[in-house]
Design a protein with these regions (language model features):
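Sec-dependent signal peptide recognition
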Residues: 2-9
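C-terminal motif of bacterial Sec signal peptides marking the signal peptidase cleavage site
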Residues: 15-18
Length: 193
């Protein structure tokens, strides 16, 4: 438990240090009503933050592991880019990490790559602690059932509780740790004007 909180705190600090934030954020409604049908969002829309806390118990079926992770996501002002940072600890022989579409307790298809940035898988042998992946997801990066669709379609799945991040390893090729993506605890959407 203590290790999970430390990893989460470090991940939040790392992500926040790399993000431009307005000096005095204004709390907005936690909704996607401002997201337009063309995949962008209106000029007065909020900057949105999401988080997934990953553990073996959330995998389907559950995996017994000491590995933990945190994925932090931030939507840009026009809703066309979703920046992310994926941090993990105590995990061995990583092969890949993704965003999948499915509710908690159900496995679903890959819709975006987090590590590496695309196929094929890349093995990191041995134990890994630190930032596994960071980058930006756009509509062009969506794969599987979201290929050719907009980032808004991914955000709709997040809003409905139907998106998760997970990390795959050689010993658990279906996924060793997983976490549903949701609005971040303690993080609020902020006005970007």
């Amino acid at each position: 438990m203590k290790t999970s909180l430390i990893v989460f705190a470090i991940a939040v600090l790392i992500f926040i240090s790399g993000c431009d934030q307005p000096a005095e954020p204004e709390i907005q409604n936690n909704s996607f009503e401002d997201i337009s049908k063309d995949g962008g969002i209106t000029s007065d829309a909020a900057l949105l933050n999401f988080v997934a806390v990953l553990s073996g118990l959330q995998e389907v079926p559950p995996v017994e592991t000491r590995a933990r992770g945190t994925a932090i996501f931030q939507l840009n002002a026009d809703g066309t880019e979703l920046s992310y940072k994926l941090v993990c600890a105590n995990i061995r022989n990583i092969t890949q990490a993704h965003i999948h579409i499915a509710p908690a307790g159900v496995n679903g298809p890959v819709v975006a790559w987090l590590y590496p940035s695309g196929p094929p898988s890349v093995l990191i042998p041995g134990i890994f602690n630190g930032v596994l992946g960071e980058g930006t997801i756009t509509a062009a990066n969506l794969v599987g059932p979201l290929a050719g669709l907009t980032l808004n379609d991914l955000l709709d799945a997040v809003k409905a509780g139907n998106a998760y991040a997970n990390i795959h390893t050689t010993q658990n090729p279906g996924g060793e740790i997983r976490g549903q993506i949701a609005f971040g605890n303690g993080m609020v959407p902020v006005n970007v004007e």
